[in-house]
Amino acid sequence: ELEFRAWLQEDPKQIIEIPKKLNSNYELINSEKELDKIIKLASKSKVIAIDTETTGLDYMDAELVGVSLSYEAGKAFYIPFGHEKQEIPQLKEKIVMSKLKPFLEKAKNKIIGQNIKFDRNILTRYGINIDSIKNDTMMMSYVLDASATRHNLDALSSYYLNYKTSTFEDVAGKGVKQVTFDKVPLELATDYAAEDADITLRLYETLEPKLNDIKPLKKLIEEIEIPLIEVLSDMEQNGTQLNSKILASQSKDLESRIKKLEKSAYKIAGEEFNLGSTKQLREIFFEKLNYRVIKKTPGGQPSTDEKVLQELAEEYELPKVLLEHRTLSKLKSTYTDKLPGQISTNTGKVHTSFHQAVTTTGRLSSSDPNLQNIPIRTE
């Protein structure tokens, strides 16, 4: 069901069976004394799992609501400071940051996380610089099986720990009724946030022996993938400079060229029509202009897909005009119109998200915006 193809071939007996209800102890930390105590205990540990809870997924805009820690499987702590209208008291953000900063910055080669690049980006904005990351369970899973389709915490917990984690919807609601995490009651938030850190630590303890048994993969994650997390994190935060004035000028030029192509298409067809309508294209191509039918759709209708247009463009002018119209419209809607709207008001730059654990080949991908898909220059 989870489509973990290679993993399914493993001996089922090797999968750790844990009851649906984990043996766990999750605590809310809302006093300086308690915070000092867990920091002291965590500092003595060889591995510290961390997780941040925020108001959103945009690492340049989301507000930090709380931080969870786990240094022993089954034991985790949630330190909230940004929840709204709570009867249970919280520590002030300034106090939490002042104590976590020296603790986390000194914990070199100890800190692990699940997609820890996001946590690193968030914490950097709050003045905490995490370097020398020990590991990332998402990347451990990816290195073990790059062909698996999911490396998120819920999927890994289900597969490796036989445990179904709480989902964001469980605590924040669904659809239009869903709230941001700062509005989630602290009782629910504590179990959810602490569980994330606890499960991350449990996964690390499960995946580490598997990687240790395969030396090339262990070397890959230690020497390339984990160091790359910090490089990509820095790249994301630095952002990419865009000249919105040039983009606006290009958008205006594209709009003019698109309108000229539309007029040209109308003239060739002998009537105005919707260039994006498959039905109208079919009528004009095959009923009015009698173009030859190259192939048909599963429904038996003459096809007007991209390959058909390219072949018809070798014989007729209208398909050639339509292909150029589509190319320019794509450039305008995807790039010259959209990119300026993705420029951060805080930095004046575009901040993409790079993904290490997506492609089976190991290459990077990016999103919001996809800066690896900018088209090459055309004539």
Where do the language-model regions lie?
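Short helix-interrupting loop/turn segments at helix-coil junctions
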Residues: Q114, Y163-S166
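Acidic beta-strand-to-loop metal/phosphate-binding motif
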Residues: A49, K108-I116
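Helix-loop-beta element that forms the nucleotide-linked donor phosphate-binding surface
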Residues: Y126-I130
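Long, compositionally biased intrinsically disordered terminal regions
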Residues: M139-V143
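Conserved "right-hand" nucleotidyltransferase catalytic core of DNA-directed polymerases
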Residues: E1-E84, E105, T124, N135, ...
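Short, basic/hydrophobic alpha-helical segments
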Residues: Q90-K108
